[in-house]
């Protein structure tokens, strides 16, 4: 893995009402994405659905997300970024029912992953990585996806214990060889 190559943090994060943390202005995954970008000097890009999930009702948000999952939907996303120039892509998302949100697959399917190193990181409320890294590996054809080496941080920790979250991010990045 080329830890000195050009790096990108691409992520999806939900704001508004969230499970276990109430109404938030800054999404759990966004917080972790920013920490990774700050520590590694990586560029950062948000994967944003063209039609945002509802912010006022978490129940409505998860209903829509569950419908997308059941339909194997590929919801449109806002804009795009050319990943060709990047060697390493940190890919972040919340774990919803043991799956990345479907907009992550929309992003993945728009790109050629040959020769890229993809490093998943997730936020969750108790389920951990739950095999989502393996699903990312199956979707990112031609990439070296670091399954079993991703980072999983509880959303509540990201929101309410940022010093702990930052320590976890720093230790993880050091273990991967990105920081000293």
PLM features: residue spans?
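Short, conserved loop/helix-junction motifs that constitute active-site signature segments
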Residues: 2-3, 83-84, 109-115, 138-142
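Glycine-rich phosphate/pyrophosphate-binding loop and the adjoining helix
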Residues: 144-180
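Generic recognition of short, well-ordered alpha-helical segments
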Residues: 102-106, 131-134
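Short, glycine-/small-residue-rich phosphate/pyrophosphate-handling segment
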Residues: 119-152, 160
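N-terminal beta1-alpha1-beta2 submodule of the flavodoxin-like/Rossmannoid cofactor-binding fold
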Residues: 1-88, 98, 105, 167-180
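Soluble non-cytosolic domains of exported or imported proteins
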Residues: 23-27, 98, 126-130, 159, ...
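Solvent-exposed loop/turn segments at secondary-structure junctions
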Residues: 14-17, 50-52, 95-99, 124-128, ...
